[in-house]
């Protein structure tokens, strides 16, 4: 018998084929692992609400809805021209103004021209103001000149009131000094009375 020859006692094993039930088992094991990790996280960081969606992701700051009125501008922060156009359309809708035909557009322009600062409008406004001044009407405008400045306001330079606290306690030195001064004053008054009596001067009590 040739030693190099090899005799197979058993047939070779069949090739491994991934069956569908094995794939489902692997996916189920992955979901079980994820759920177990989530329950561990919930146990560490406190209870999670039952009605909260696990796939919920918080929105970024400043990405709120609205026409550029969020914290950082929103989605329409740079598009101010379109926002102004939309605001103008909404204004017209609220005022029930329709400018669909050329006649309506022309009428709307003529109506707006009445308030334009032309020379005739300025002249008529000045005449109305003069008439109101002659009638003695008070000026209720909110201009800068009509309002007093902080330096002209009467309470601008008013000193704040000092808070009343408990009386200060006198030290022993001040008490002794006060008693000594009182005694010296009494002695001086007695000396002046005796001196005036000796000189023949009458001392009348002050009424």
Swiss-Prot record:
Region annotation Disordered: where it falls in the sequence: 1-81, 140-169
Extent of Polar residues compositional bias: 21-40, 140-152
Domain of life where this protein originates: Eukaryota
InterPro entries: NUFIP1_cons_dom (IPR019496)
Protein keywords: Nucleus
Ranges of biased composition (kind: Basic residues): 58-70
Basic and acidic residues: compositionally biased ranges: 156-165
Signal peptide (from-to): none
GO CC entries: nucleolus; nucleus
Keyword DNA damage attached: no
Principal cellular location given in the protein's record: nucleus
One Gene Ontology biological process: cytosolic large ribosomal subunit assembly
Entry keyword rRNA processing: no
Annotated compartments: Nucleus, Nucleolus
Protein known as: Uncharacterized protein C16C6.03c
Organism in which the protein naturally occurs: Schizosaccharomyces pombe (strain 972 / ATCC 24843) (Fission yeast)
